[in-house]
């Protein structure tokens, strides 16, 4: 009797074995179903990371573009500043030359007047006249190097841009609008008239 009590019935053993197998199968199934889920979660994390990195890359590229634009604008500003500075220097230089020429013209006029009114027949005055003529020539040669040119339009056609008509006179065998006399020479500085020549102009005969 005692041995029969200790012996586990075969049916019970089989039942317990079935339960164990079912549990093991369920564990395997749960493990297999969890693996794709974990892989999916890992894949989603990778995609999120890639998206974040792409956004950071796009932001960095935009910052580079903006910085390049800033550099280009800065370079353009420097070029413009240099150009404006050069123009200002050039204008100041021209203005200084104009002021210098304006102050010098009366001196030239006085020397020319002294020569034209001098008695060239007087032998005692010849050395002085020659000295004044040399001084005038030297002065004109010097100012010519700085762009100051004489306007002396005798026998030329009247040009209202460079000449100022003081009077008109009919002269035989001379076509109208010709400069027949120059009362005062004019001057231009680097192509710009700073004083027109005062002239007498021919007109048609009545």
From Swiss-Prot:
UniProtKB keywords: Chaperone, Cytoplasm, Stress response
Q: Which Pfam families match?
A: GrpE
Gene that specifies this protein? grpE
Q: What does this protein do?
A: Participates actively in the response to hyperosmotic and heat shock by preventing the aggregation of stress-denatured proteins, in association with DnaK and GrpE. It is the nucleotide exchange factor for DnaK and may function as a thermosensor. Unfolded proteins bind initially to DnaJ; upon interaction with the DnaJ-bound protein, DnaK hydrolyzes its bound ATP, resulting in the formation of a stable complex. GrpE releases ADP from DnaK; ATP binding to DnaK triggers the release of the substrate protein, thus completing the reaction cycle.
Record-linked Gene3D superfamilies? 3.90.20.20, Head domain of nucleotide exchange factor GrpE
By sequence similarity, the record places it as follows:
Belongs to the GrpE family.
Query: What is the annotated quaternary arrangement, including any partners?
Result: Homodimer.
Q: Name the GO cellular-component terms.
A: cytosol
Q: What is this protein called?
A: Protein GrpE
Subcellular localization is given as: Cytoplasm
